[in-house]
Regions:
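Pyridoxal 5′-phosphate
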Residues: 1-4, 8-257
Length: 257
């Protein structure tokens, strides 16, 4: 079904102005064909935005190749500071947009009759900028570029394949989301153990997972669960980390079941 993934026809009408999709699910790890989806949206005359917060840290991204009108990323998911993000936009689109807030350095001229605004991106960056966060985010992005995004992707693809094999057959464990095109994000449930209780045991074993809805409660419920645990890979994850999860889960099963 991955090959058929696209925007449903009924979701695109002549009234559609903007289509926003995620590049990679932070719950399921599913990687979406955003280039194809962008073409669909543009055929209907709509703008196209990619939420790449989960996507951009795991593989190369070329906004010109994707032909997206907007692309958003966060700082903390790119190994950078919290409280900052980036919105890429095609300049011709940004030029048509009014500022959403006012403040210093985003105004060109002010008179009693009218105000003119600076060209993008300055018109969207009102007030004192988050200079420290911006410098930190820039260094984080430079670090990933030096490592090479293709190298990071190859490393994580190997871990993802290994985890599918190792975790997919664990007794009493269900992996949530099994798309072929998948990144290093694994949500899972263990029969008879609440994810929060499981996380407590895993934490004692030196394994950090997140539990809950992962800011996507409708999706988690659509998959048939109230809450799930999630293990994610990064550029620092190694095979030994993947191998550490099964015995830790077995310890939790012995404790609670």
């Amino acid at each position: 079904r991955q090959r058929q993934m696209c925007i449903r026809d009924r979701a695109l009408t002549p009234r559609t102005k903007l289509v926003a999709v995620t590049g990679m699910s932070n719950v399921l790890g599913t990687i979406f064909p955003v280039k194809r989806m962008a073409a669909q949206a543009h055929r209907q005359g709509a703008l196209f935005l990619v939420d790449a917060c989960q996507y951009i840290v795991h593989q190369p991204v070329d906004v010109q190749d994707l032909d997206c009108d907007f692309l958003a990323i966060s700082g903390h998911k790119t190994y950078g500071p919290t409280g900052i993000g980036v919105l890429y936009g095609k300049y011709k689109v940004l030029e048509t947009m009014p500022p959403y807030q006012c403040g210093g350095d985003m105004v060109d001229t002010v008179t009693y009759d009218k105000t003119t605004f600076m060209p993008p991106p300055a018109r969207f960056e009102a007030g004192t900028p988050a200079s420290v966060q911006a410098i930190g985010l820039g260094e984080a992005l430079n670090y990933m570029q030096k490592l090479g995004m293709n190298n990071i992707k190859a490393h994580e693809d190997g871990l993802t394949a290994y985890a599918r094999e190792l975790w997919g057959s664990l007794p009493g464990v269900t992996l949530v989301g099994t798309a072929k095109e998948k990144g290093g994000v694994f949500s899972f449930v263990v029969d008879g153990i609440h994810p929060q209780d499981l996380a407590f045991v895993l934490d004692k074993e030196g394994i950090a997972v997140r539990t809950g809805h992962h800011c996507a409660e409708p999706l988690v419920h659509r998959m048939g669960y109230e809450t799930v645990a999630r293990a994610s890979f990064g550029l620092y994850t190694v095979r030994e980390d993947v191998e550490a999860l099964p015995p830790a889960i077995r310890k939790a099963q012995k404790m609670f079941l």
